[in-house]
Design a protein with these regions (language model features):
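Membrane-lumen/periplasm interface segments of multi-pass, membrane-embedded glycan/lipid transferases
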Residues: 239-288
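Multi-pass membrane glycosyltransferase architecture that uses lipid-linked
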Residues: 2-246, 283-420
Length: 420
């Protein structure tokens, strides 16, 4: 009779070994980088970064070679952290060209995504137990969307700060959570949406203090930027809202079949270009969309009955999805924020299926369908319009379905809220 050695590997031991998961997670992404190194040659971008925004970031970082800096000499549609980071990475890899820049950028995003994996396990363990936390980490590691966007843009950094703020809030470390939410708002505005959950799940005095910390972090940085050059700083707060609609049901109503890309890097030297409308004006004004979203949000706010940790995560998730649904545009990289939150809310086969379907629809639209236009910044026309419309409607249906599921989760049971 054979005896099993203590060194023999079993399925349970393998799947329960977090160090092994980290090794596979990092190793797969590094090997992908080695096999498909990012290059730009003869006017064509190739490698793992092809189809993303890194080459555009590289061109923006190139302004610094002439002494031109973001928020002083050129405007950005994002808060300050992303493009100041771009300048730092450009300067650090100036002699290595685009390949060096893209590889360093991707490695930094890999570090953030590694943090996302660790936070998924930690929060999953807190919400559902150790086994489910480990299972969620494995599922996240196998998701293709976060892997792709490591090499395409800075969305893993946004998701990391959002999850870090949420994890701190779950641990009742509210000051730390507020600080991270404030930092997150300096990357993208979405991490600040956690404020809605704070006001619903914490006493008013604590929520007010939390809000004040977020505002202080955000306001102190923007105060310095406005003092330096208000004209070049203002577009970071307004440009996204001044764009015409794109890749949403709102865009279909407006007859806009284009992406939401801004113009060439050189156009950012003139702040007037931040307000140039490149498509048809909105049939439904932005203020109306915001009003509808606010009404839906207030309805959920008033009807929520679940005040445990699972309810808190569900509330943050539905807030994020409502915001994305009301937005005039859709960006594929938002998957990086959506996927971990949905998995934390629905650690089931249905939850995994939902994020896989959402990812499939998103990538079928971009890059698959957009590449058929011959210009990823171009417009849908002819035979491409029908599949484009179908994909937009399918994605919207999935997001609405997730919101319905989250609302039901928030209505499941009445848990008495207690304050520490």
């Amino acid at each position: 009779m054979k005896t099993r050695s203590s060194s023999d590997l079993t399925l349970g031991a393998l799947l329960g070994d977090f160090r092994l998961l980290l090794t596979l997670f990092i190793g797969f992404r590094l090997l992908l980088l080695l096999a498909y190194q990012p290059v730009y040659t003869q006017g064509v971008e190739r490698g793992v970064s092809a189809g993303g925004d890194l080459f555009y970031y590289y061109l923006l970082g190139g302004f610094s070679a002439d002494g031109l800096l973001p928020f002083r000499d050129w405007w950005s549609e994002f808060p300050p952290i992303p493009h100041f980071l771009t300048v730092i990475l450009y300067q650090a890899t100036a002699r290595a060209g685009y390949s060096g820049f893209a590889m360093l950028y991707g490695l930094l995003m890999l570090a953030f995504d590694l943090g996302n994996l660790i936070l998924m396990r930690r929060m999953g363990r807190r919400l559902y137990g150790a086994n489910t936390g480990m299972a969620l980490a494995w599922i996240y590691a196998l998701m293709i969307a976060p892997t792709v966007f490591i090499w395409w843009n800075f969305e893993p950094m946004v998701a990391f700060v959002l999850l870090l703020s949420l994890a701190a809030l779950l641990g009742k470390r509210e000051t730390r959570s507020a600080l991270w939410a404030g930092v997150g708002a300096l990357i993208k505005f979405t991490p600040a949406l956690i404020l809605g959950a704070v006001w619903r799940f914490r006493a008013p005095a604590r929520a007010l203090r939390y809000t004040a910390i977020v505002a202080a972090v955000f306001g102190s940085v923007y105060g310095l930027l406005f003092a330096q050059n208000a004209t070049m700083t203002l577009p970071s707060l307004t440009a996204q809202f001044n764009k015409s609609s794109y890749q949403t049901v709102w865009a279909l109503l407006d007859g806009n079949y284009r992406t939401g890309n801004f113009g060439t890097p050189q156009e950012r030297l003139d702040p007037a270009n931040a307000n140039v409308l490149t498509g048809n004006p909105s049939v439904i004004p932005g203020i109306v969309r915001l009003g509808i979203a606010a009404a839906v949000g207030l309805f959920v706010f008033a009807r929520a009955r679940r005040f445990d940790d699972k309810g808190l995560v569900a509330f943050v998730t539905i807030t994020l999805l409502i915001f994305f649904l009301q937005a005039q545009g859709w960006s594929p990289q938002w998957l990086v924020q959506i996927i971990p939150l949905v998995l934390l809310c629905f650690p089931t086969r249905d939850g995994v299926t939902a994020v896989v379907l959402l990812s499939a629809v998103t990538f079928a639209e971009y890059p698959f369908l957009w590449l058929r236009t011959g210009d990823i910044g171009g417009a849908m026309s002819g035979a491409l319009v029908t599949p484009f419309v179908i994909l937009v409607l399918a994605r919207t249906t999935i997001l609405v379905g997730l919101c319905v599921g989250l609302y039901r989760r928030l209505r499941e049971e009445a848990v008495i809220r207690t304050e520490d």
